């Protein structure tokens, strides 16, 4: 009898230990899991109730106190309701459940998470009103509820969320007036998308107070009526304002931010008139001369031949105004005929087939310097690839789509009439760089030809603007793919084998720049946003050479390169990837800077965490896990769960990454050694 009692006590004690081994954070997550109807084994394979905490579970991130700070389960085909237990995770900072099939109303408990910074629920089937309690999320910076079935009005309860930078409510059933007060209070907004709803009334004047907007202000596909408020003229000129498919009426205000948007931004409003839709208003003369549209300078000699400056479209293609180009071309030709006795044309032989003679004519002067300085109305189109398949005329007639922008200019996707797709980077340097210097720099860039470096195809020069033309790379950048951003390669495609080959390709490109380029260059700003992915996910290192051309801020050295960014955060993205010693302006640029940055790219590839958005220092976090002998899966990207049999390879890559991010640059390996390590790893799997 006593033996039976002891056995019973042992069983009860063991059961109690199992039942209580998981902390309150894990229990809340298990309640969340239970509310999901189709629990995929691949998603919740390591959500184990016997764990002491949930910090190693797929999609879960914890801080140093083992409190859950983020839940990221995008595109996992999950369905069910959002369990109120999620509101008990009081340290939660980020929730990303986009592209699933969650349904029902948002639980009020969700809005008790006072520290929540990002809430991304796009692409689900949520419905009902957004609770008034959303105003309690005063730390919220990103709110994306797009592509759901929410209804009701957009409430002033959002006003307390003054830190909001991204507000995306598109493709729902929100109705009623857009309240006055949002624009004047949410002044930090960088993205505002309210398209495809049922919003009515006039556009509030205080929308013009959103002077920090970047990219697109999208109010399209609603039922807004009345006139376009003149306050929109306060918005940044590079912003694309989409007001299409509403019931707006009257003349379009003559502000550059609206004129630059192009006609597609106003289509579907039958009672609008004026430029850029070219429907005259009966009450006023709305004709705008080209100088008002394309330049602020009164002197016609300084106008640019490149009409790319006028293209601001991000969603719909904007046709380049070839007729205006011809107008300027004829004027240039007339001036050439008038002054032919005192002009000399210097035409590069390899340009004769693709360049109009007028673009390479300079007045005869006493010196080369005088020639270049005094003739600021000249333009040059220069192919850098002998097999180039387009000329300047074709480029000017092409459709252009704005892909992104940074502090050094804009990047467009250009589609030629024959279907050829190009990427055109438009640089602005305020005229400081003369033709001779520009051509010398781009010729140096063009000599860097490697399968893993984005190669320059052609360039165009004018005194105040420069164009660099590249092949268009279709699969976006590596950072977007890792983070699973919309429009990028699905993170599911980034298996461990694919990631390893991408890292090897980047190492090949950097090794070529370091070891085999004419001057053994330093790239200077390697990060995942300027690693582009080709059709077969082969990496292309982009942005090389830009710092030599653009007169950027003083923190960019003459031989450093600014990356192709798609956004312009307050703290520039590349600063998160910089080597510690690069912060000193007294330090000479070194190839070991690139090694450090590449080390961070490696860690981002392995962990799935970005140095920019992570709650903690990525290097310190991985180093700490290594020092505490944490299992590999503690730091690995949850998406890599299916490749668990390759864990040894992943551990080796983590070691390479940690070697590259040594604080002492002398202890970092050379890129050649890093490449050799990756070659061995790829061969071994």
UniProtKB/Swiss-Prot annotation:
Domain named Protein kinase: residues: 397-682
Keyword set, alphabetical order: Cell membrane, Glycoprotein, Leucine-rich repeat, Membrane, Phosphoprotein, Receptor, Repeat, Signal, Transmembrane, Transmembrane helix
Signal peptide extent: 1-21
Species assigned in the record: Arabidopsis thaliana
Location(s), subcellular: Cell membrane
Keyword Repeat among UniProt keywords: yes
Family: Belongs to the protein kinase superfamily. Ser/Thr protein kinase family.
Sites of Phosphoserine modification: 399, 480, 590
Lipid bilayer topology: Single-pass type I membrane protein
Protein name: Probable inactive leucine-rich repeat receptor-like protein kinase At1g66830
Cellular compartments per GO CC: plasma membrane
Ranges in the topological domain labelled Cytoplasmic: 327-685
Lineage of source species: Eukaryota, Viridiplantae, Streptophyta, Embryophyta, Tracheophyta
Membrane-traversing stretches: 306-326
Segments annotated as LRR repeats: 65-89, 90-113, 115-136, 137-161, 162-185, 186-210, 212-234, 235-260
InterPro entries recorded: Kinase-like_dom_sf, Leu-rich_rpt, LRR_dom_sf, LRR_N_plant-typ, PRK1-6/SRF4-like, Prot_kinase_dom, Ser-Thr/Tyr_kinase_cat_dom
Glycosylation sites: 38, 48, 151, 193, 247
SUPFAM superfamilies, per the entry: L domain-like, Protein kinase-like (PK-like)
């Amino acid at each position: 009898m006593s033996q039976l009692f002891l056995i019973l006590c042992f069983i009860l004690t063991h059961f109690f230990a199992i039942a209580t081994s998981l902390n309150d954070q894990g229990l809340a997550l298990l309640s969340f899991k239970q509310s999901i109807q189709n629990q995929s084994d691949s998603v919740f394979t390591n959500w184990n109730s016997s764990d002491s905490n949930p910090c190693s579970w797929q999609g879960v991130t914890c801080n140093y106190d083992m409190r859950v700070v983020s839940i990221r389960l995008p595109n996992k085909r999950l369905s069910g309701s959002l369990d109120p237990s999620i509101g008990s995770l009081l340290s939660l900072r980020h929730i990303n459940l986009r592209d699933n099939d969650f349904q029902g109303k948002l639980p009020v408990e969700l809005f008790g998470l006072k520290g929540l910074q990002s809430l991304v629920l796009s692409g689900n089937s949520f419905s009902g009103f957004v609770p008034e309690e959303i105003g309690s999320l005063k730390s919220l910076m990103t709110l994306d509820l797009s592509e759901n079935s929410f209804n009701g009005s957009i409430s002033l309860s959002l006003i307390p969320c003054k830190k909001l930078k991204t507000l995306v409510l598109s493709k729902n059933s929100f109705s009623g007036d857009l309240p006055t007060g949002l624009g004047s209070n949410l002044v930090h907004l960088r993205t505002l998308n309210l398209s495809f709803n049922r919003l009515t009334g006039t556009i509030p004047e205080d929308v013009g107070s959103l002077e920090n907007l970047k990219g697109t202000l999208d109010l399209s596909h609603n039922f807004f009526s009345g006139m376009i408020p003149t306050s929109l003229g306060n918005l940044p000129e590079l912003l694309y304002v989409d007001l299409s498919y509403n019931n707006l009426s009257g003349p379009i205000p003559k502000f550059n931010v609206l004129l630059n948007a192009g006609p597609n931004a106003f289509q579907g409003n039958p009672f609008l008139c004026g430029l850029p839709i070219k429907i005259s208003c009966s009450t006023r003369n709305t004709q705008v001369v080209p100088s008002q549209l394309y330049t602020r300078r009164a002197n016609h000699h300084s106008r640019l031949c490149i009409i790319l400056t006028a293209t601001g479209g991000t969603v719909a293609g904007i046709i380049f105004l070839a007729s205006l180009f011809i107008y300027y071309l004829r004027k240039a030709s007339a001036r050439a005929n008038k002054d032919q006795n005192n002009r000399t044309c210097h035409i590069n032989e390899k340009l004769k087939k693709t360049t109009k003679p007028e673009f390479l004519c300079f007045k005869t002067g006493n010196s080369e310097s005088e020639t270049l300085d005094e003739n600021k109305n000249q333009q040059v189109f220069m192919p850098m690839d002998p097999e180039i398949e387009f000329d300047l005329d074709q480029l000017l007639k092409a459709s252009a789509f704005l892909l992104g922008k940074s502090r050094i200019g804009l990047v467009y996707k250009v589609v030629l009439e024959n279907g050829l797709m190009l990427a055109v980077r438009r640089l602005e340097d305020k005229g400081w760089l003369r033709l001779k210097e520009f051509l010398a720099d781009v010729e140096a860039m063009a000599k860097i030809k490697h399968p893993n470096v984005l190669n320059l195809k052609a360039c165009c020069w004018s005194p105040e603007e420069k164009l660099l033309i590249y092949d268009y790379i279709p699969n976006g950048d590596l950072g977007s793919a890792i983070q699973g951003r919309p429009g990028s390669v699905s993170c599911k495609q980034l298996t461990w084998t694919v990631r390893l080959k991408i890292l090897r390709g980047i190492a090949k490109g950097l090794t070529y720049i370091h070891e085999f380029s004419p001057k053994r260059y330093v790239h200077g700003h390697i990060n995942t946003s300027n690693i582009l992915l080709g059709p077969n996910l082969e990496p292309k290192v982009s942005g090389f050479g830009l710092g030599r051309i653009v007169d950027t801020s003083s923190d960019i050295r003459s031989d450093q390169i600014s990356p192709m960014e798609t956004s312009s955060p307050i703290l520039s993205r590349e600063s998160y990837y910089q080597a510690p010693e690069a912060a000193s302006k007294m330090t000479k640029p070194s190839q070991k800077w690139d090694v450090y940055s590449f080390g961070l790219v490696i860690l981002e590839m392995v962990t799935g965490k970005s140095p920019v958005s992570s709650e903690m220092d990525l290097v310190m976090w991985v180093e700490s896990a290594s020092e505490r002998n944490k299992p590999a899966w503690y730091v690995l990207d949850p998406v890599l769960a299916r490749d668990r049999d390759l864990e040894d390879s992943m551990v080796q890559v983590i070691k390479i990454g940690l070697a590259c991010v040594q604080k002492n640059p002398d202890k970092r390996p050379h890129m050649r050694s890093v490449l050799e390590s990756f070659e061995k790893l790829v061969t071994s799997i």
